[in-house]
């Protein structure tokens, strides 16, 4: 029953939708509301969220605003990039990887404040409802979960606006606010809705909020060097920064050179296809560099095994299973593969392209020019290849002698 909830922690952005949810929770559940706003690098001022919550009757001690940027990159983005994770061949999982941290922190605040429920603003059609709720239940299976979009009858924009006006919630539009449904963090920004709901319709150029069009990017390329330790980025052009600082710097470089735009139709976990556009400038650079480093530091079979496991790992993140035992098992294997992923990668950035022009690892490179040179060598006997080929062809030879045709 609705009156059984005493206190609820709401994932709160300060925007119209979550402000309506806040008021709806107060009215429908007659409960105390705690707001939680996460700073994961979305690029918006968060103090307005505090003021908005106060204006809606939330006590100061029940307003939580947390800077999670470094934790987000260090404990979520970097581990994911050790795996080179991509969903359905293209999507760098920018929204998916942010939800577990938000859910975990929200559940922790519920414990801290004695709340018996949590609430989110994800719709009943999308993946985020699954990601949030799997996260909540992983940390506290006794929490009641309130998903307003699955309960209320405010099922149109007109009804939402009417509810806001009735309850004195400010509905003034922010200057420069995009008409698209957007989600942003340090790894990416996404766009959905409006003309994008027709997959045949190209997005307008003014939709893209972060990056230059590759056509308008500088005519001069830029060379950068990225340093890695155990698979994680530690420095850009020799400058060591915090995890959040490193990704911020990569984003600046990628946006400048028109890198990281993506327009895809993806298969949602709930069963439908969805068209989305994404900008992941820093992540696109990071993925290219990390794979280049692995090309000289990973054993062949280890690298191939990682590539076989990656789609499963990516699907676990996309579908909301970050805290699952199977994801943690895969992570342990992936992290073991990164012990020798130390070195430097040199890249050229130019009009939407990330071009690898050098890679080196002073202590961990498995590239040995003495073995692969096209010049005369003394370490590799080419005659050995004949026996290698014959043994590997043995099954073909036996089948052929048995009359089988291929």
Swiss-Prot record:
Pfam families: Arginosuc_syn_C, Arginosuc_synth. SUPFAM superfamilies: Adenine nucleotide alpha hydrolases-like, Argininosuccinate synthetase, C-terminal domain. Its EC number is 6.3.4.5. L-citrulline binds at residues 91, 96, 127, 131, 181, 190, 266, 278. One of its GO terms (cellular component) is cytoplasm. GO terms for molecular function: argininosuccinate synthase activity; ATP binding. ATP binds at residues 11-19, 38, 121. Pathway: Amino-acid biosynthesis; L-arginine biosynthesis; L-arginine from L-ornithine and carbamoyl phosphate: step 2/3. It catalyses: L-citrulline + L-aspartate + ATP = 2-(N(omega)-L-arginino)succinate + AMP + diphosphate + H(+). Keywords: Amino-acid biosynthesis, Arginine biosynthesis, ATP-binding, Cytoplasm, Ligase, Nucleotide-binding. GO terms for biological process: argininosuccinate metabolic process; L-arginine biosynthetic process; urea cycle. It is found in: Cytoplasm. L-aspartate binds at residues 123, 127-128. Homotetramer. Belongs to the argininosuccinate synthase family. Type 1 subfamily. HAMAP family: Arg_succ_synth_type1. This is Argininosuccinate synthase. It comes from Campylobacter jejuni (strain RM1221).
